Amino acid sequence: MPVTAHSAHVAHAVRLDRAGGPETLALSEVAVAEPGAGEIRIRHHAIGINYIDVYHRSGAYPLPAPFGIGVEAAGVVEAVGEGVSHLRVGDRAAYVSQPPGAYATLRVMPAKCVVKLPDAIGFDEGAAMMLKGFTTQYLLRRTLPQGGLAAGDFVLFHAAAGGVGLIACQWARALGLQLIGTASTDEKCAAAKAHGAAFTINYARDDFAARVREITGGKGVKVVYDGVGRDTWDKSLDCLQPFGLMASYGSASGKVPPFDLGVLGAKGSLFLTRPTVFTHIATRESTQVMADELFAMVTSGQVKIPVEHRYALTDAAQAHADLEARKTVGGSVLVP
């Protein structure tokens, strides 16, 4: 039998009957079962908001209806199923996982996805850092060009004032990398600079490919980390050194259209990858390794998690509207 701290288990959760705009986000009451073997039940104190939530809501990443959204949160473990040894009732915990369903007051989920949250890290930070922090970790530490990256190397990071971008600016600075960050306004460029970007480019005003060549003395960068997609794709390839790596990890502006692979050869024998966080956290061991490194960066003060926007769970629609309108800087969370 699971160890439990509560007997009544009803959650308020965002459930969608169909894909669509922010107006489809509505709260409903759902029954929450006891955790089975290998599962835990967690009561959320904060829920991270990410662009993947928009993809799920809009149908860009289709899910069978009815469905929930949200892939990261932080809270307190309420119940532990059979066979779970790394978590106990009362533990502060955080996670990023599939399937979606974090937009809820509590939920049951696989324990392998959940890690203990250090006392030095608040719930808002924990909820805002898991997907974005794990993404930064696998990009800067695992998604590397031939020979890896060394202090002084140039990399280009699009949307550098976003949730992932502001973490990446800080992490890159700690690694000694020369991160060139792009953003859509001067204010966002200033935010990226303040968080550690060596150089910034307002891509709404300047030709970012030309500026990258200027900054690097014509050499280009070793890696482009691109979560924007369609709008930045072509010029991003022009920013790379020969044998450089194009890491396309998102498509905020839309999917990259089909293209001729011969372009990669013509532009310098380039490498291309489309990584996802869920490949990297497929096992509990890998998840814990990533969490340990992320938490160490945060508790040491080398990376601070900017949580600039807090919304009530009932205001999830407004949170999505603001995110899609690019009105947010840094991380955003929902509070149950």
Which stretches of residues belong to each language-model region?
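Glycine-rich beta-strand-centered segment in the early N-terminal region that forms part
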Residues: 7, 31-48, 58-101
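Glycine-rich phosphate-binding loop and adjacent beta-alpha segment
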Residues: 175, 231-302, 336
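Adenosine-nucleotide cofactor-binding segment
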Residues: 173-232, 283
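NAD(P)H dinucleotide-binding glycine-rich loop of Rossmann-like/cofactor-binding domains
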Residues: 95-159, 171
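Hydrophobic/small residue at the entry helix of a nucleotide-binding pocket
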Residues: 164
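C-terminal hydrophobic helical "lid"/dimerization subdomain
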Residues: 2-9, 284-336
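NAD(P)H cofactor-binding loop motif with strongest signal on the N-terminal glycine-rich segment
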Residues: 159-160, 228
